UniProtKB/Swiss-Prot annotation:
Name listed for the protein in its UniProt record: Uncharacterized sodium-dependent transporter YocR
Organism in which the protein naturally occurs: Bacillus subtilis (strain 168)
Superkingdom, natural source: Bacteria
Lineage: Bacteria, Bacillati, Bacillota, Bacilli, Bacillales
Keywords, sorted A to Z: Cell membrane, Membrane, Symport, Transmembrane, Transmembrane helix, Transport
Family listed: Belongs to the sodium:neurotransmitter symporter (SNF) (TC 2.A.22) family.
Main location: membrane
Role played: Putative sodium-dependent transporter.
Gene Ontology CC entries for this record: plasma membrane
GO molecular function, one term: symporter activity
Pfam families documented for this protein: SNF
InterPro entries: Na/ntran_symport, SNS_sf, YocR/YhdH-like
Length: 445
């Protein structure tokens, strides 16, 4: 694969991998859950689980991809020939396909709001719940926004790894952090901002219970894009001498940093204007527009936030489409553009029902969930945990111990004792933790 596609620099890989992991959930859901689940105490538990569960799994995917330098399906075929383990790669493809089909819908909503912001459609100080409802229920806006988001994603992925995904990530990721810093400074300087900071960061041990711990455990690998073989695909484009441990730590730290920065940027502003903190689309499309349009030059800060969310959505979308393109093109750069468009169009078509699930298809439900929510539930609660579990079993079972050490040792000074710790974590702690979280989210306990 490396003859056709390769990262031009280690930094480019780290930014692209971090961009893949930094999705909308890290910005609009995680801070709220942290604030309502123990604040600083929850953050400490999350960081602990990320180091003990998420990071070992991320390294496992890096090893699979870099050792074989093949796509998500061929990697498993190479490491476990004559077996069915390569179905992990197909599972990752299907998961990313479904995920991007409804993720692109949210990306479309963001694009519509950005257009509304630049054309004066978000200049009022109230009534944003009505604007949001009319946006997502309008079939032309919902599907049109989704289509525009997918076209941007396809154009970037079609250009290749270094010329497309890497270059885009090198622009979008620094821009994302810069916007975060600007918005953090503005947010914490507002009157009453301290209440928001306390909500997010003040440790509250009374809020820590079994559910909180289980959620922190689940987020420790969900927020790193582990379990869908995206990181297998991205690491396949790495040179053999690159330091996998350093890269994995960098991606993990950047992801945790964004989650913390999001809380500091959002909640001081929300509390400053006496509004209730919320999560998900309500936060982005209702609460934040109300907040920023009540302050001087508020539309500028609102547009900055919308752009920030757009950048996070795009960098994740690139990786979801890339795993599909990599498998279908089999590393042939001449076929990349064709499969990027074919795959992207197929994802768009499958995602149209999700785009219409709050409008003309609002009466259609699957197990009492809208089409959009049903797809989200399938990916988040079933497919991703299953993929993460299979990878945690595959790595120590099918890759020889010495090969694992050689991959982690390459480009680093990793000691045997730390390798033994990592192997212990991915072999025992990771699968047990994933099973516990899975049983919890499906309601068994």
């Amino acid at each position: 694969m490396k003859e056709a596609n390769q990262w031009s620099s280690k930094l480019g890989f780290i930014l692209a991998a971090a961009g893949s992991a930094i999705g909308l959930g890290a910005i609009w859901k995680f801070p709220y859950v942290a604030g309502t689940s123990g604040g600083g105490a929850f953050l400490l538990i999350f960081i602990l689980f990320t180091v003990l569960i998420g990071l070992p799994l991320l390294l496992g995917e890096f090893i699979i991809g870099r050792r074989t330098q093949k796509d998500a399906v061929q990697s498993y075929k190479t490491l476990a020939p004559g077996t069915k383990w390569h179905w992990i790669g197909y599972l990752g493809m299907v998961t990313c396909f479904i995920l991007l089909s409804f993720y692109s819908v949210v990306g479309g909503w963001i694009l519509i709001y950005i257009i509304k912001g630049f054309t004066g459609g978000l200049s009022q100080t109230s009534g944003f719940d009505t604007i949001f409802a009319s946006t997502i229920s309008n079939p032309y806006l919902a599907v049109g926004g989704q289509l525009l988001f997918m076209v941007v994603t396809i154009l970037v992925v079609a250009k290749g790894v270094s010329s497309g995904i890497e270059k885009a990530s090198q622009v979008l990721m620094p821009a994302l952090f810069l916007l975060f810093i600007i918005l953090m400074v503005r947010s914490v300087t507002l009157d009453g901002a301290m209440e928001g900071i306390k909500f997010f960061l003040m440790p509250d041990l009374t809020a820590i219970d079994a559910n909180t711990i289980l959620y922190a455990m689940g987020q420790s690998f969900f927020l790193l894009s582990v379990g869908v073989s995206v990181m297998v695909t991205y690491s396949a484009y790495l040179e053999k001498q690159e330091n996998l441990v350093q890269s994995a730590v960098s991606v993990t730290v950047m992801n945790m940093l964004v989650a913390v920065m999001a809380g500091i940027a959002i909640f001081p502003a929300v509390f400053s204007f006496g509004l209730k903190p919320d999560q998900g689309p309500v936060l982005l499309f209702n609460v934040l527009p109300t907040v920023f349009n009540q302050m001087p030059f508020g539309i500028i800060f609102l547009l900055a936030f919308l752009l920030l969310f757009l950048f996070a959505a795009l960098t994740s979308a690139f990786s979801m489409l890339e795993i599909l393109v990599a498998v279908l093109s089999k590393g042939d750069i001449n076929k990349r553009k064709r499969f990027a468009w074919l795959g992207g169009i197929a994802i768009f078509i499958v995602g149209v029902p999700s785009a219409l699930s709050y409008g003309v298809l609002s009466d259609v439900t699957i197990f009492h969930l809208s089409i959009f929510d049903a797809a989200d539930y399938l990916v988040s609660n079933i497919l991703m945990p299953l993929g993460a579990l299979l990878i945690s079993i595959f790595v120590p079972l099918k890759i020889p111990k010495q090969d694992l050490f050689d991959e982690l040792k390459s480009g680093s000074n990793l000691k045997r004792k730390w390798f033994a710790v990592w192997l212990l974590l991915i072999r025992y702690l990771s699968p047990v933790a994933i099973i516990i979280v899975f049983l919890h989210v499906i309601g068994i306990f």
